[in-house]
Amino acid sequence: MVYITEIQVNVPLETFIKKMDRVENKRHWQKGLVASEHISGDIGQLGAKMKLIYKFGSRKMTIVETITKRNLPHELHANYTTKTMHNIQQNYFERTTNGFTKWTSKNKFLPLNLVMRVMLYLSPSLFKKQSLTYMRDFKNFAENGISLANA
């Protein structure tokens, strides 16, 4: 499944990238993120791997992030892998005519087991909705300084 989401964030591109490119900021806009662990490579750089640990109620989820392209301030691509799903994400950032930032995210989800294949088939909108939630939460963090770290 492939889809594209877009959002305008009302901060200059430089401010957007400074907030987006800091590992410690992820907890402010990725609800449920409880820990991150460097695995390999230079943090945030091409080829770097990081373990992201999320907790949703009593459910724990571990995702491995691998940076696949870094061309800031315009592009940041990464793969996100769990035991059941592989997500190829391509993020594009551009300065708008009014001096803000347009964030376009292209996602491709590849299920790694039958259960996820069925879930992706039956509820594809859940994945797009979650992507949009993260984008809106980043927008709120970047524009208003509102953190989800303790939410």
Where are these regions (language model features)?
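Hydrophobic/aromatic beta-strand elements that line small-molecule binding cavities or substrate pockets
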Residues: T5-I7, H38, L52, I63-K69, ...
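Beta-strand/loop substructures that line and gate deep hydrophobic ligand-binding cavities in soluble
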Residues: T81-T133, A149-A151
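Hydrophobic ligand-binding cavity/cleft-lining segments
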Residues: M1-S40, Q45, T133-Y134, N140, ...
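Beta-strand elements of well-folded, non-transmembrane domains
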Residues: V11, F56-S58, K69, F109-N113
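A short, structured loop/turn motif at beta-sheet edges
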Residues: L13-E14, G41-Q45, T68-H74, Y92-T104
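Glycine-rich portal/gate segments that line the openings of hydrophobic small-molecule binding cavities
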Residues: E37-T84, T133-A151
